[in-house]
Each structure stands twice: as C-alpha cells, then as structure tokens.
Swiss-Prot record:
CDD domains per record: GATase1_PB
Keyword set, alphabetical order: Glutamine amidotransferase, Hydrolase, Lyase, Pyridoxal phosphate
Catalytic residues in the record: C78 (nucleophile), H170 (charge relay system), E172 (charge relay system)
The name this protein goes by in its record: Pyridoxal 5'-phosphate synthase subunit PdxT
PROSITE patterns cross-referenced by the UniProt entry: PDXT_SNO_1 (PS01236), PDXT_SNO_2 (PS51130)
MF terms in GO: glutaminase activity; pyridoxal 5'-phosphate synthase (glutamine hydrolysing) activity
The keyword Lyase is assigned to this record: yes
Catalysed transformations (reactions): aldehydo-D-ribose 5-phosphate + D-glyceraldehyde 3-phosphate + L-glutamine = pyridoxal 5'-phosphate + L-glutamate + phosphate + 3 H2O + H(+); L-glutamine + H2O = L-glutamate + NH4(+)
Organism annotation: Desulforamulus reducens (strain ATCC BAA-1160 / DSM 100696 / MI-1)
Pathway: Cofactor biosynthesis; pyridoxal 5'-phosphate biosynthesis
Annotated binding of L-glutamine, by residue: G46, E47, S48, R105, I134, R135
Amino acid sequence: MVIGVLALQGAFIEHQKSLAACGVDSIQVRKPHQLEDIQGLIIPGGESTTMGKLMNQFELFEPIVEKAHNGLPLFGTCAGMIMLAKDIAGSTQPRLGLMDIEVERNAFGRQVESFETELTISELGEAPVRAVFIRAPYIKSVAANVKVLAKYNEKIVLAQQDHYLVAAFHPELTNDVRLHQHFLKMIK
C-alpha cells in the first residue's frame, strides 16, 4: 500500500512520518500523474486559499475529484478539511467540495490562540487523543450521511463520510498514530 500526501505546503513530511510509523509507504504528490499509483491521499494543513491556488496552478483539482469519485480515500486535516468541504461559511474560495459539510475557517481564533487538548474518540479506543489546533476550522453542519467522530466545546472537529475523513486538528504533530491507522483501515 502506498499513500500519497499532497506536498504543496503544510506538514506533509510529518504526515509521512506518521504513515511510516504505521508501517506504510508514502509519496509526496505535487503533480497529477503522482496520483496514479496511490491507494489513499492525505491533504494536510496549511493555508486553504493558498493551497487552492497551488492546486489550481498544478492542475490537481480535476484529477483528485475524479480519483475520489472512483473511490480513492481522502483524509483532510485543518486546511485539508476546508478543501474537502462542500461549503465554506462566507467564502467562495476554490475547494474540492467532496464532503457534505459546511466549515468555518479560523474558528478558534488567530495563530496566537492555537492550543492543544485531549479528545475522546470512541472509534480509536478509550485513551484520549492529543489534538493540536492551529488557526483551526470547525464543522458548522453535516448532512445525515456524515458521521461525527469528535467534538470540542460542542463544535464538530472530526467527521467521516464514506471514504472521506476530516480533522480540524493536526494528528501528524503528535506521536499518536491512531487517526492515521483509522484512515488506513478505511482503505483495506
């Protein structure tokens, strides 16, 4: 199994380290042809408007959407979650628009208000998950076909719809690989 990690900006190397800790190979994806031999794709954090511009410049939107419609599992973290959302509150920025969610950008404040906390995610076991929130979005609303996996202060921060998984936080910035393992189980 080989997982692609979109490598235009953000913590893509940290995602690759998490995948390696799970015993899985990964490649950095910057061009459409690199999507051909992967079994899943992680879209990392970063700045979502910049990411959208870069994805457009590198002609990645259509190939990712096509692969996703054909069943390619996607995992979006922070800005990656924004890119997967069908709706972004108050924004018309470019996005993949694959997941039936509406997100609010920078919902937990500015960079200086970034924080870490522990989340209970029953799908990942009893031990809490350390979650790093950096200028994080949250999910304002979900369609009936979206499963909410975790909330923080009553705000949805982790959700799954079919072969799409999104997190408002950065699991790759901790040593806990359970969320990456959950994504990998979606592929097998």
